[in-house]
């Protein structure tokens, strides 16, 4: 496991690699972000952005999603995985935002997770990106990178990864660390083909060292 100084070194290096890392889901307000993140489960941001480009022209407010039959909304997002269930959740959360929150997306994470289809990860993304609240949202990239480097234990749950990162990373750096770990995992430390040979963290990375000993790191 990495110590705090090593973690700081790793995060600084990742910051050098991806200094402009930010949320890649296109949105213009908190409600659009909630919808986009809800759509992004088990789906790429690129595909979500292709769908929301037209979706957000047709549906601008929570009321708009309730003004059409469920089947119509399902057709509008059909190219996205799990579209039937996601459409149901979008209509349900739209109704709840109108009835319980006066048409405005709640700023509190504990309130956000009450919305259908909004889990802890989605809520953390929304409070961080839309409202500037320090948070670390653990997606597949953040989890993979944290475990490969040895910031977290292999057996840690997603919630344990989040809590470990919150302990080991200064609070003021939570949000930027979240985005940089995503970029590092998405574009460099990929699930199937991590770019270990050109990685500045290879000497510290337990997964990279293991791959190197097996002759899997081609220089």
Swiss-Prot record:
GO terms for biological process: base-excision repair, AP site formation. [4Fe-4S] cluster binds at residues 189, 196, 199, 205. Residues 109-128 form the HhH domain. Its cofactor is [4Fe-4S] cluster. One of its GO terms (molecular function) is metal ion binding. This is Endonuclease III. It catalyses: 2'-deoxyribonucleotide-(2'-deoxyribose 5'-phosphate)-2'-deoxyribonucleotide-DNA = a 3'-end 2'-deoxyribonucleotide-(2,3-dehydro-2,3-deoxyribose 5'-phosphate)-DNA + a 5'-end 5'-phospho-2'-deoxyribonucleoside-DNA + H(+). InterPro entries: DNA_glycosylase, Endonuclease-III-like_CS2, Endonuclease3_FeS-loop_motif, Endouclease-III_FeS-bd_BS, HhH-GPD_domain, HhH_base_excis_C, HhH_motif, Nth. The gene is nth. It comes from Bacillus subtilis (strain 168). Pfam families: EndIII_4Fe-2S, HHH, HhH-GPD. Disruption phenotype: Cells lacking this gene have a 5-fold increased spontaneous mutation frequency. A triple MutS/MutL/nth disruption has a 280-fold increased spontaneous mutation frequency. Transmembrane segments: none annotated. Its EC number is 4.2.99.18. Binds 1 [4Fe-4S] cluster. Belongs to the Nth/MutY family. DNA repair enzyme that has both DNA N-glycosylase activity and AP-lyase activity. The DNA N-glycosylase activity releases various damaged pyrimidines from DNA by cleaving the N-glycosidic bond, leaving an AP (apurinic/apyrimidinic) site. The AP-lyase activity cleaves the phosphodiester bond 3' to the AP site by a beta-elimination, leaving a 3'-terminal unsaturated sugar and a product with a terminal 5'-phosphate.
